[in-house]
């Protein structure tokens, strides 16, 4: 059974009187920095001088330093720049300026788990991974609520690493909703497997194949778009709010019966085998190696695949439908 921490299980005390350097001021970095500051903690920012976020951070009242300077001043360093930028920034600006006993926090375990970042032994290494976008992290905090998070300890130099991790989670509002204890390996692998097989890869391809099938059968593309893409949000909202069983109780009996009898024929047991194969590539590190190579080559395969999606008929129809629906 998962161990879940609530607000009463965490304290901000371990962070009181300490300097927290948030590295990065993108959507997630900005949200976490603002929340920590609003929780009464001392937050500075480490950014690239001249970067587009520098002036914004200054305007919003933060003390801003170049990354190496911020790390040197910090007791806690939160690495909130994109995954693929982290190894170079770590090697050149973060690690050379770390003090012994510093707490280093990541929002995703990718670089630590796959060995792209190797921290020195004299620092704590923790992870606080909000399970929601930065905008939600900020908005929920301001509403007196929070976005759930995962928390993990990779390296416990001080003997208090989990206390620090929970303090960070409390500071950004996550313990209000609940924080689940995990490991860097579990967070990284489940995140990648879930993205590839369901949330991004699987769902996207299911929608595209459904659209293609309806159009090939002679139905109007606009009607096909509504049936397989637009209405997907309505069903996912029901699942998110009520669970799968609750969703079924929120649709018609015809939809229930058709879905329960035909769905398993479309997504059958053979799909699980292919999911296991994708999972094996993630767990072995094969996917990480492939992606790092692709990124270092400038992303030619990614650009090609993105262009194919952009030019798919469902996207062309979608532009018109979203203009009709939302005035975009």
Swiss-Prot record:
Mg(2+) 1 binds at residues 191, 195. The gene is ilvC. It comes from the Archaea. It catalyses: (2R)-2,3-dihydroxy-3-methylbutanoate + NADP(+) = (2S)-2-acetolactate + NADPH + H(+); (2R,3R)-2,3-dihydroxy-3-methylpentanoate + NADP(+) = (S)-2-ethyl-2-hydroxy-3-oxobutanoate + NADPH + H(+). Binds 2 magnesium ions per subunit. Mg(2+) 2 binds at residues 191, 227, 231. GO terms for biological process: isoleucine biosynthetic process; L-valine biosynthetic process. Belongs to the ketol-acid reductoisomerase family. Substrate binds at residue 252. The keyword RNA-binding does not apply. Keywords: Amino-acid biosynthesis, Branched-chain amino acid biosynthesis, Magnesium, Metal-binding, NADP, Oxidoreductase. Pfam families: KARI_C, KARI_N. HAMAP family: IlvC (MF_00435). Involved in the biosynthesis of branched-chain amino acids (BCAA). Catalyzes an alkyl-migration followed by a ketol-acid reduction of (S)-2-acetolactate (S2AL) to yield (R)-2,3-dihydroxy-isovalerate. In the isomerase reaction, S2AL is rearranged via a Mg-dependent methyl migration to produce 3-hydroxy-3-methyl-2-ketobutyrate (HMKB). In the reductase reaction, this 2-ketoacid undergoes a metal-dependent reduction by NADPH to yield (R)-2,3-dihydroxy-isovalerate. This is Ketol-acid reductoisomerase (NADP(+)). It comes from Pyrobaculum arsenaticum (strain DSM 13514 / JCM 11321 / PZ6). Disulfide bonds: none annotated. One of its GO terms (molecular function) is NADP binding. Its EC number is 1.1.1.86. InterPro entries: 6-PGluconate_DH-like_C_sf, KARI, KARI_C, KARI_N, KARI_prok, NAD(P)-bd_dom_sf. Pathway: Amino-acid biosynthesis; L-isoleucine biosynthesis; L-isoleucine from 2-oxobutanoate: step 2/4; Amino-acid biosynthesis; L-valine biosynthesis; L-valine from pyruvate: step 2/4. The active site is at residue 108. NADP(+) binds at residues 25-28, 48, 53, 83-86, 134. Residues 2-182 form the KARI N-terminal Rossmann domain. Its cofactor is Mg(2+). Residues 183-328 form the KARI C-terminal knotted domain.
């Amino acid at each position: 059974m998962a161990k879940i921490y609530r607000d009463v299980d965490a304290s901000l005390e371990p962070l009181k009187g300490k300097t927290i350097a948030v590295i990065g001021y993108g959507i997630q970095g900005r949200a976490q920095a603002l929340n920590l500051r609003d929780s009464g903690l001392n937050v500075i920012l480490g950014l690239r001088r001249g970067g587009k976020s520098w002036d914004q951070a200054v305007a919003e009242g933060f003390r801003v330093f170049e990354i190496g300077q911020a790390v040197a001043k910090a007791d806690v360093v939160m690495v909130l720049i994109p995954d693929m930028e982290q190894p170079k920034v770590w090697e050149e600006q973060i690690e050379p300026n770390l003090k012994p006993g510093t707490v280093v926090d990541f929002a995703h375990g990718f670089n630590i788990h796959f060995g792209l970042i190797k921290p020195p032994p004299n620092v704590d290494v923790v992870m606080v991974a909000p399970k929601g976008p930065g905008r939600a992290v900020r908005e929920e905090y301001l509403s007196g609520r929070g976005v759930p998070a995962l928390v993990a300890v990779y390296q416990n130099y001080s003997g208090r690493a989990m206390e620090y991790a929970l303090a960070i989670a409390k500071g950004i509002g996550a313990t209000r909703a609940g924080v689940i204890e995990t490991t860097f390996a579990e967070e990284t692998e489940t995140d990648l497997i879930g993205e590839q097989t369901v949330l991004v890869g699987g769902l996207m391809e299911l929608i595209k194949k459904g659209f293609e099938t309806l159009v090939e059968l002679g139905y109007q593309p606009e009607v096909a778009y509504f049936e397989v893409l637009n209405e997907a949000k309505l069903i996912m909202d029901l699942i998110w709010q009520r669970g799968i069983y609750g969703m079924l109780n929120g649709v018609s009996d015809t939809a229930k019966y058709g879905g329960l009898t035909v769905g398993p024929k479309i997504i059958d047991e053979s799909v699980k085998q292919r999911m296991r194969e994708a999972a094996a590539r993630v767990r072995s590190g094969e996917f990480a190696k492939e992606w790092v190579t692709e990124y270092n080559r400038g992303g030619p395969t990614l650009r090609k695949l993105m262009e194919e999606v952009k030019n798919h008929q469902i996207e062309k129809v979608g532009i018109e439908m979203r203009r009709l629906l939302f005035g975009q």
